[in-house]
A protein has these predicted regions:
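Glycine- and other small-residue-rich loops at beta-strand/loop junctions that grip anionic moieties
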Residues: 24, 99, 153
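Class I SAM-dependent methyltransferase SAM-binding "motif I" and its flanking Rossmann-like core
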Residues: 130, 134-137, 143-154
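A short, structure-level motif marking secondary-structure boundaries and short turns
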Residues: 7, 20-21, 66, 93-95, ...
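Cofactor-/ligand-binding subdomain signature composed of acidic, glycine-rich
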Residues: 1-15
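Conserved small/polar residues in nucleotide/adenosyl-binding loops
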Residues: 157-160
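Thiamine diphosphate
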Residues: 57-131
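Short secondary-structure transition/capping segments
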Residues: 93-101, 139-148
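Active-site diphosphate/adenylate-binding microenvironment
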Residues: 12-73
Length: 160
Protein backbone atom coordinates (compact mmCIF):
# COMPACT_ATOMS: atom_id res chain seq x y z
CA UNK A 1 0.00 0.00 0.00
CA UNK A 2 1.34 3.41 -0.92
CA UNK A 3 1.75 6.14 1.70
CA UNK A 4 1.31 8.83 -0.95
CA UNK A 5 -2.01 10.60 -0.44
CA UNK A 6 -4.06 11.47 -3.54
CA UNK A 7 -4.82 15.20 -3.59
CA UNK A 8 -8.42 16.33 -3.25
CA UNK A 9 -9.62 18.02 -6.43
CA UNK A 10 -12.60 20.09 -7.47
CA UNK A 11 -14.21 20.74 -10.85
CA UNK A 12 -12.12 23.91 -11.13
CA UNK A 13 -8.91 21.85 -11.00
CA UNK A 14 -9.88 20.16 -14.28
CA UNK A 15 -10.75 23.41 -16.10
CA UNK A 16 -8.05 24.69 -18.46
CA UNK A 17 -7.39 28.34 -19.27
CA UNK A 18 -8.39 27.82 -22.93
CA UNK A 19 -11.41 29.73 -24.20
CA UNK A 20 -14.15 27.27 -25.18
CA UNK A 21 -14.96 27.70 -28.88
CA UNK A 22 -18.19 25.81 -29.41
CA UNK A 23 -21.33 27.37 -30.86
CA UNK A 24 -23.69 29.04 -28.37
CA UNK A 25 -26.19 26.52 -27.03
CA UNK A 26 -24.16 23.48 -28.11
CA UNK A 27 -24.64 20.39 -25.96
CA UNK A 28 -20.87 19.91 -25.82
CA UNK A 29 -20.72 22.52 -23.04
CA UNK A 30 -22.85 20.32 -20.78
CA UNK A 31 -20.71 17.25 -21.49
CA UNK A 32 -17.53 19.19 -20.69
CA UNK A 33 -18.96 20.66 -17.47
CA UNK A 34 -20.22 17.29 -16.25
CA UNK A 35 -16.91 15.58 -17.06
CA UNK A 36 -14.95 18.27 -15.20
CA UNK A 37 -17.34 17.86 -12.27
CA UNK A 38 -17.05 14.06 -12.27
CA UNK A 39 -13.25 13.66 -12.62
CA UNK A 40 -12.52 14.49 -8.94
CA UNK A 41 -14.81 11.65 -7.82
CA UNK A 42 -12.48 9.02 -9.31
CA UNK A 43 -9.93 9.59 -6.54
CA UNK A 44 -6.99 9.75 -8.95
CA UNK A 45 -4.28 12.32 -9.54
CA UNK A 46 -4.83 14.68 -12.48
CA UNK A 47 -1.64 13.29 -14.00
CA UNK A 48 -3.34 9.88 -14.28
CA UNK A 49 -5.89 11.11 -16.85
CA UNK A 50 -5.25 11.27 -20.60
CA UNK A 51 -7.84 12.53 -23.09
CA UNK A 52 -7.34 11.54 -26.74
CA UNK A 53 -9.48 13.03 -29.51
CA UNK A 54 -9.72 13.02 -33.30
CA UNK A 55 -11.34 15.70 -35.46
CA UNK A 56 -14.64 17.52 -35.06
CA UNK A 57 -16.32 19.74 -32.52
CA UNK A 58 -15.96 17.20 -29.71
CA UNK A 59 -12.28 16.86 -30.43
CA UNK A 60 -11.40 20.23 -28.95
CA UNK A 61 -12.18 18.62 -25.60
CA UNK A 62 -8.55 17.91 -24.52
CA UNK A 63 -7.76 21.63 -24.80
CA UNK A 64 -10.46 22.39 -22.24
CA UNK A 65 -9.34 19.81 -19.68
CA UNK A 66 -6.49 20.58 -17.30
CA UNK A 67 -4.98 17.13 -17.81
CA UNK A 68 -2.85 15.35 -20.38
CA UNK A 69 -4.28 15.13 -23.87
CA UNK A 70 -3.69 14.44 -27.55
CA UNK A 71 -5.56 15.90 -30.51
CA UNK A 72 -4.96 13.29 -33.20
CA UNK A 73 -6.03 12.90 -36.82
CA UNK A 74 -9.54 12.13 -38.04
CA UNK A 75 -10.90 8.87 -36.67
CA UNK A 76 -7.65 7.67 -35.15
CA UNK A 77 -8.20 8.52 -31.48
CA UNK A 78 -8.96 4.89 -30.49
CA UNK A 79 -5.70 3.70 -32.09
CA UNK A 80 -3.62 6.39 -30.36
CA UNK A 81 -5.44 5.81 -27.05
CA UNK A 82 -4.74 2.08 -27.34
CA UNK A 83 -1.04 2.84 -27.69
CA UNK A 84 -1.12 5.15 -24.67
CA UNK A 85 -2.85 2.45 -22.61
CA UNK A 86 -0.47 -0.32 -23.69
CA UNK A 87 2.55 1.83 -22.82
CA UNK A 88 1.01 3.15 -19.57
CA UNK A 89 -1.51 0.59 -18.25
CA UNK A 90 -2.10 2.45 -14.98
CA UNK A 91 -3.41 5.61 -16.67
CA UNK A 92 -7.10 6.40 -17.08
CA UNK A 93 -7.31 6.84 -20.86
CA UNK A 94 -10.33 8.54 -22.42
CA UNK A 95 -11.27 8.57 -26.11
CA UNK A 96 -13.22 11.71 -26.96
CA UNK A 97 -15.02 11.41 -30.28
CA UNK A 98 -18.14 12.37 -32.16
CA UNK A 99 -20.53 10.35 -34.29
CA UNK A 100 -18.78 11.45 -37.49
CA UNK A 101 -15.22 11.02 -36.24
CA UNK A 102 -15.80 7.81 -34.30
CA UNK A 103 -18.47 6.00 -36.28
CA UNK A 104 -17.67 7.04 -39.85
CA UNK A 105 -14.05 7.79 -40.67
CA UNK A 106 -12.85 6.12 -37.47
CA UNK A 107 -15.42 3.34 -37.36
CA UNK A 108 -12.84 0.64 -37.96
CA UNK A 109 -10.57 1.91 -35.16
CA UNK A 110 -13.55 2.26 -32.82
CA UNK A 111 -14.67 -1.31 -33.57
CA UNK A 112 -11.19 -2.76 -33.02
CA UNK A 113 -10.75 -0.88 -29.75
CA UNK A 114 -13.97 -2.54 -28.56
CA UNK A 115 -12.86 -5.91 -29.90
CA UNK A 116 -9.52 -5.69 -28.07
CA UNK A 117 -11.50 -5.00 -24.88
CA UNK A 118 -8.87 -2.61 -23.59
CA UNK A 119 -9.47 -0.56 -20.48
CA UNK A 120 -10.42 2.60 -22.39
CA UNK A 121 -13.22 5.03 -21.61
CA UNK A 122 -15.04 6.21 -24.73
CA UNK A 123 -17.04 9.42 -24.56
CA UNK A 124 -18.96 9.69 -27.83
CA UNK A 125 -20.73 12.99 -28.58
CA UNK A 126 -23.70 12.13 -30.81
CA UNK A 127 -25.31 15.20 -32.38
CA UNK A 128 -26.40 13.23 -35.49
CA UNK A 129 -24.58 15.60 -37.88
CA UNK A 130 -21.05 16.61 -38.79
CA UNK A 131 -21.22 19.65 -36.50
CA UNK A 132 -17.92 21.20 -37.52
CA UNK A 133 -18.99 21.45 -41.17
CA UNK A 134 -22.53 22.36 -40.08
CA UNK A 135 -24.35 20.48 -42.75
CA UNK A 136 -23.20 16.99 -43.63
CA UNK A 137 -25.19 14.07 -42.27
CA UNK A 138 -23.38 11.52 -40.13
CA UNK A 139 -23.84 7.76 -39.61
CA UNK A 140 -26.42 8.52 -36.91
CA UNK A 141 -28.45 11.13 -38.86
CA UNK A 142 -32.14 10.42 -39.18
CA UNK A 143 -33.48 9.11 -42.50
CA UNK A 144 -34.89 12.11 -44.38
CA UNK A 145 -32.58 14.57 -42.59
CA UNK A 146 -32.42 17.85 -44.52
CA UNK A 147 -29.11 19.69 -44.27
CA UNK A 148 -27.15 22.24 -46.31
CA UNK A 149 -25.34 19.34 -47.97
CA UNK A 150 -28.52 17.28 -48.47
CA UNK A 151 -31.27 19.81 -49.27
CA UNK A 152 -33.62 17.03 -50.41
CA UNK A 153 -32.99 14.93 -47.33
CA UNK A 154 -31.06 11.78 -46.61
CA UNK A 155 -32.65 8.97 -48.60
CA UNK A 156 -31.11 5.53 -48.29
CA UNK A 157 -33.13 4.36 -51.31
CA UNK A 158 -31.67 7.05 -53.58
CA UNK A 159 -28.14 6.37 -52.30
CA UNK A 160 -28.32 2.66 -53.16
Amino acid sequence: MSDVKTPTYTKKDFESDQAVRWCPGCGDYAILAQTQKTMPTFGRKKEDFVFVSGIGCSSRFPYYMNAYGFHTIHGRAPAVASGVKIANPDLSVWVITGDGDGLSIGGNHFMHALRRNMDLNILLFNNRIYGLTKGQYSPTSEVGKVTKATPFGLSLIHIS
